[in-house]
Amino acid sequence: MTKTIGLLVMAYGTPYKESDIEAYYTDIRHGKKPTEAELQDLKDRYQFIGGLSPLAGTTNRQAESLRDALNQAYDDVEFKLYIGLKHIHPFIEDAVQSMHEDGIDEAVTVVLAPHYSSFSVGSYNTRAQKEADKYGITFKHVEHYYQQPKFIQYWTEKINETLADIPQDEHDKTVLVVSAHSLPKGLIEKNNDPYPNELHETAQLLEQHSNIIHVAEGWQSEGNTGTPWLGPDVQDLTRALYNEHKYEHFIYTPVGFVCEHLEVLYDNDYECKVICDELGVHYHRPKMPDTDPLFIGAIVEEIKNVY
């Protein structure tokens, strides 16, 4: 007999329409409304990438692809999909409540972020678990999947494809910039958080498995809190690498993200490219994982480790 269990896929969330932006930004800021200038700055960024982020649709497609792949991988279990978002509806708590209403008493949770931090993946899991405890739902949490061979294979293939478009004699003048979303430095250090080390391990694995010669690690998209965040920022790193090594090609792999959204389309494709153009060097950014079977397969393999 097939058993039905829940699959809770959690993600950051993004505004569905322009009128959602203020409430969304306020939620990110823990209930503190943005100033008019701050709100306009965010609206301008969205306009620059085409109006709104494609994240909402991509999250749904990724979640559906994962559900389908899991239902193919397991013979005796049927996974029922629920999507819970951090900063906009359907919120994480809404998804767990829907599970309860559907009679789900067991579920697997996964966040669409490959590296673990207590301030990112950990906070999603805590919110989900707190709500699940109200209803007696048992959760198995996926904490990370950056180390899964299929995840590394995806990025290795994309790096090698990008290198293939660069003349062979310029490979030694090419650098791979491996990055993830920055987080407050003090909190990371105080809690001995594994997040920076997980990015470092990812960079090492990509260096080992791909044809790239030079690799650098950076952070991006830091918040404006007035306190130090993990660095170096990828923009500062780009200038420093050029000044020291005179690299001619920069390949940006924002491996902490799993699809194209504001942080990639603006922070990489605009801000980093502006610096590359200013320096007279070539900007490259391989395709993000989205619903690629290797990426989805990496999460499936990690779920097999917990359920």
UniProtKB/Swiss-Prot annotation:
Pathway connected to this protein = Porphyrin-containing compound metabolism; protoheme biosynthesis
Family annotation (CDD domains) = Ferrochelatase_C, Ferrochelatase_N
Residues that, per the record, bind Fe(2+): H181, E263
Which terms are listed as keywords in the entry?
Cytoplasm, Heme biosynthesis, Iron, Lyase, Metal-binding, Porphyrin biosynthesis
Residue numbers binding Fe-coproporphyrin III: Y12, R29, R45, Y46, S53, Y124
Q: Which Pfam families match?
A: Ferrochelatase (PF00762)
> Record's superkingdom?
Bacteria
Annotated catalysed reactions: Fe-coproporphyrin III + 2 H(+) = coproporphyrin III + Fe(2+)
Keyword Cytoplasm among UniProt keywords: yes
List the record's Gene Ontology CC terms alphabetically. cytoplasm
E.C. numbers? 4.99.1.9
Q: Which GO terms describe its biological process?
A: heme biosynthetic process
Q: Which GO terms describe its molecular function?
A: ferrochelatase activity; metal ion binding
Q: Report the subcellular localization.
A: Cytoplasm
Q: Provide the family line.
A: Belongs to the ferrochelatase family.
Q: What does this protein do?
A: Involved in coproporphyrin-dependent heme b biosynthesis. Catalyzes the insertion of ferrous iron into coproporphyrin III to form Fe-coproporphyrin III.
Q: Which NCBIfam families match?
A: hemH, PRK12435.1
Its recorded name reads: Coproporphyrin III ferrochelatase
- Please give the organism: Staphylococcus saprophyticus subsp. saprophyticus (strain ATCC 15305 / DSM 20229 / NCIMB 8711 / NCTC 7292 / S-41)
